């Protein structure tokens, strides 16, 4: 059993599968916002040590693209950063998932790309999706959205 701080109270629970959105990974190497860099690194470290972190092929592609195009990180360095995620569970996007993501986008009024993230998290049986792009606290198909940059949210410990 592990403990998680939930709005100030510790609770015991079984290890959770936690899906990371691209922005959380990008902040780990973005030097423009030190607070988000620190928070992202802490969350990823904590989840990796205490839970089961999950990504998808979409997240890895977006991470590589954002780090090389927006952050101007050298392509070989960015490739090595992607390689560092090899020990996490990686969900491979397929046609059925794309079709499901379209349904999610229609039902929940989300962008297709955000819907594909939700679908990948659902396929991996994740309890939480860590992102600053979706509505924190919202539950979509049983997955709770968590924005780690909002103080009232869950911080995994």
Residue ranges and their predicted role:
Residues 90-132:
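Active-site neighborhoods of divalent-metal-dependent phosphate/nucleic-acid chemistry enzymes
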């Amino acid at each position: 059993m592990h403990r998680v701080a939930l709005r100030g109270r510790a609770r015991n629970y079984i290890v959770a599968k936690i899906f990371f959105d691209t922005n959380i990974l990008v902040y780990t190497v973005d030097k423009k916002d030190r607070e988000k860099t620190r928070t992202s690194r802490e969350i990823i470290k904590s989840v990796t040590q205490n839970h089961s972190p999950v990504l998808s092929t979409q997240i890895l592609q977006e991470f590589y693209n954002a780090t090389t195009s927006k952050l101007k990180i050298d392509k070989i360095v960015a490739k090595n950063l992607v390689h560092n995620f090899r020990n996490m569970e990686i969900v491979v996007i397929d046609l059925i998932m794309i079709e499901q993501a379209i349904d999610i986008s229609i039902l929940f009024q989300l962008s297709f790309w955000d819907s594909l993230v939700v679908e990948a998290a659902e396929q991996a049986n994740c309890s939480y999706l860590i992102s600053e792009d979706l509505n924190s606290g919202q539950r979509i198909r049983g997955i709770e959205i968590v924005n780690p940059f909002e103080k009232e949210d869950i911080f995994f410990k």
